[in-house]
């Protein structure tokens, strides 16, 4: 039996779906892990843009967005849990104190309150952010089990992949952090 000190904390890591990922919801995804503890894990899929853009989402929640470069930024599918709820992964904003914000080890924050979107709409919010609808969640031990069955690769997250890399390149870019490419991955799990 492992001691609590033996636990691996995957907070601020990418989960990269292996080719043998059985769940089609996560096939080909990169998930940024916002929280990982003995109670479970919470992450956001960062490479599945939806057909909803910021302008249409802001209209739905009665916020006016007039900042031209932001209007057509896509909203992402963050995962199959709470798909009606928004999750904003962002760099910290000096002096900002959003109502429902969680600091993530490694420097990013995740905010679920509308005030961060109000700040974005007025130009006072985070400059680099990713907005998702929904999140990915795992119960106690569930993620560890999926990793042990070769469902996921893990690697320390790089914010440049989250914020600066085009969505369609994030999977390969995350694999590149491990020094591999998708052509090197096998769908077959091997055990000695």
Swiss-Prot record:
GO cellular component: cytosol
InterPro entries in alphabetical order: AlgH-like
Signal peptide: none
Family: Belongs to the UPF0301 (AlgH) family.
NCBIfam families reported for this sequence: PRK00228.1-1, PRK00228.1-2
Matches recorded under PANTHER family: UNCHARACTERIZED PROTEIN YQGE (PTHR30327), UPF0301 PROTEIN YQGE (PTHR30327:SF1)
Protein name: UPF0301 protein Bcep1808_0798
Organism expressing this protein natively: Burkholderia vietnamiensis (strain G4 / LMG 22486) (Burkholderia cepacia (strain R1808))
Lineage, top ranks: Bacteria, Pseudomonadati, Pseudomonadota, Betaproteobacteria, Burkholderiales
């Amino acid at each position: 039996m492992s001691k609590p000190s033996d636990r691996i904390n995957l907070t601020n890591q990418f989960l990269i779906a292996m080719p043998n990922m059985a769940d089609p919801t996560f096939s080909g995804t990169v998930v940024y892990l916002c929280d990982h503890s003995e109670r479970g894990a919470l992450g956001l899929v960062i490479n599945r843009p939806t057909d909803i853009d910021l302008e249409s989402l802001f209209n739905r929640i009665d916020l006016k967005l007039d900042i031209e470069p932001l209007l057509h930024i896509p909203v992402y599918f963050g995962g199959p849990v709470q798909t009606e709820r928004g999750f904003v992964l962002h760099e910290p904003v000096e002096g900002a104190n959003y109502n429902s914000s969680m600091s993530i080890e490694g420097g990013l924050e995740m905010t679920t309150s509308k005030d961060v979107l109000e700040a974005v709409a007025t130009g006072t919010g985070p400059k680099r952010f990713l907005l998702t609808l929904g999140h990915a969640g795992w119960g106690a031990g569930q993620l560890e089990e999926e990793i042990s069955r070769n469902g996921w690769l893990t690697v320390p997250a790089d914010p440049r992949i989250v914020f600066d890399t085009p969505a369609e390149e994030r999977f390969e870019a995350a694999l590149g952090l491990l020094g591999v490419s998708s052509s090197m991955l096998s769908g077959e799990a091997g055990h000695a």
